[in-house]
Design a protein with these regions (language model features):
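Extreme N-terminal starter segment of soluble prokaryotic enzymes
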Residues: 2-9
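Short glycine-enriched, charge-decorated loop/helix-capping segments at active-site entrances
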Residues: 20-29, 122-126
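Active-site alpha/beta core segments
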Residues: 34-145
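Short acidic-hydrophobic, aromatic-tinged amphipathic segments that line or gate anion-handling sites
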Residues: 200-207
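Short internal beta-strands
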Residues: 47-50, 170-177
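Short, well-ordered alpha-helix to beta-strand connector turns
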Residues: 6, 43, 104-105, 168, ...
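Short, flexible loop segments at boundaries between secondary-structure elements
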Residues: 173-187
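Histidine-anchored nucleotide/phosphate-binding helix
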Residues: 35-39, 155-166
Length: 207
């Protein structure tokens, strides 16, 4: 596969709280860093996303008395999984993993910073009427093919890939550069959605 000037690598949420020892650790999450470092030099354009929640965020189980992490509730924009407190603005858990070294990244996109709305996708809040601005950023730069890596495969990576397709972009998920939470078969469910949407799954060796 030839990587061109119209391609962008989007590295999703490689942060301390999603890696080993973190508040919402994804199993083997740290392993994506080596793969990302290996493929990153092939891309002229790169964007990092960073989960960036205020304390007391509505997606935290602790904000809903009597609720526990991983339960589902209904919020104004639909179903919301409740999470342990994680990636709180300014905390060590919200920092990028210290081994992640991507100084060539052109943009750091913070998401989930609105108190009452969660944000899995790099393109939209969980309320799909609220864009993050990434679509416009890519359009201005004529970037039409999006390669996704990071955490977690079945949530923030997956939702970003699906939204890329809805916006008319080509979307590739680099499987060995991702790890999944895989809660209640969430990995297989997102893959079924990938198939319907035309998201392409590849390994890093194809890049």
């Amino acid at each position: 596969m030839q990587i061109t000037a119209q391609d962008v690598l989007v590295v999703i949420d490689v942060q301390n709280d999603f890696c080993s020892g973190g508040a919402l650790a994804v199993a083997d999450g740290d392993a994506v860093i080596e793969v990302i470092h290996r493929i990153a030099p092939k891309f002229e354009h790169m964007i990092l996303t960073q989960d960036w929640h205020p304390a007391g965020h509505s997606s935290f189980a602790s904000a809903h008395p009597g609720k526990k992490p991983f339960e589902q509730i209904e919020l104004s924009y639909g179903a919301q999984t409740l999470w342990p407190d994680h990636c709180i603005q300014g905390s060590k858990g919200a920092e990028f993993h210290p081994a992640l070294r991507l100084p060539q990244a052109e943009l750091i996109l913070r998401k989930g910073y609105r108190l009452q709305i969660d944000s899995y996708s790099a393109f939209f809040e969980n309320d799909p009427t609220i864009p993050t601005g990434l679509a416009g950023y890519l359009e201005e730069r004529k970037l039409t093919r999006v390669f996704l890596a990071g955490l977690a495969y079945d949530y923030c990576v997956g939702y970003s890939a699906l939204d890329a397709r809805r916006l008319g972009l080509q979307a590739y998920v680099i499987l060995d550069a991702c790890r999944a939470i895989d809660m209640e078969s969430s990995a297989s469910k997102i893959e079924a959605e990938f198939d319907r949407a035309g998201v392409i799954l590849i390994e890093s060796e194809a890049v």
